Amino acid sequence: MKKNALINAELSYVVATLGHTDEITICDAGLPIPDETQRIDLALIPGVPTFIDTVKAVLGEMQIEGVVMAEEFAQVSPDLHQALIALIRNEELLCGKKITLSYVSHEAFKVHTQDSKAVIRTGECTPYANVIFQSGVVF
């Protein structure tokens, strides 16, 4: 369910049309995006927009109840992983609900993106900077 206003019309529309348990993926510049999945390509140049800035914008709009990440994210890019975890924990405090964290292999993550309503590509060039958000409800 949508919470606020985004400037990007395509992204705003996707968030507004999410139902309970629908998923979207936010990814780095290198994640392969399935042909059959809607691609919202925000990448301009390497590093713009960042993964974290994109996550913040989406969290400002979307109620989440679950998160899926690749196990490799925490191992290979621990600083960015911890920044994401901090945002998720803050979101839990703001919404007063527990958000489930799940980890899968990077290969399984890539397969899981096929279930996303959309994949949002950022300019992030940090390895494994990818997350799947599962939509929750605001009530």
Curated annotation (Swiss-Prot):
Pathway where it operates: Carbohydrate metabolism; D-ribose degradation; D-ribose 5-phosphate from beta-D-ribopyranose: step 1/2
EC number in record: 5.4.99.62
Keyword Chaperone: no
Annotated PANTHER family: D-RIBOSE PYRANASE
Signal peptide: none
HAMAP family in UniProt: D_rib_pyranase (MF_01661)
Pfam family for this entry, one: RbsD_FucU
InterPro entries assigned to the protein according to its UniProt record, in alphabetical order: D-ribose_pyranase (IPR023064), RbsD-like_sf (IPR023750), RbsD_FucU (IPR007721)
Protein name listed in UniProt: D-ribose pyranase
Protein location: Cytoplasm
Superkingdom of source: Bacteria
Active site: H20 (proton donor)
UniProt keyword terms in alphabetical order: Carbohydrate metabolism, Cytoplasm, Isomerase
Main function: Catalyzes the interconversion of beta-pyran and beta-furan forms of D-ribose.
Ligand binding (substrate): D28, H106, Y128, A129, N130
Organism the protein comes from: Photobacterium profundum (strain SS9)
SUPFAM superfamilies: RbsD-like
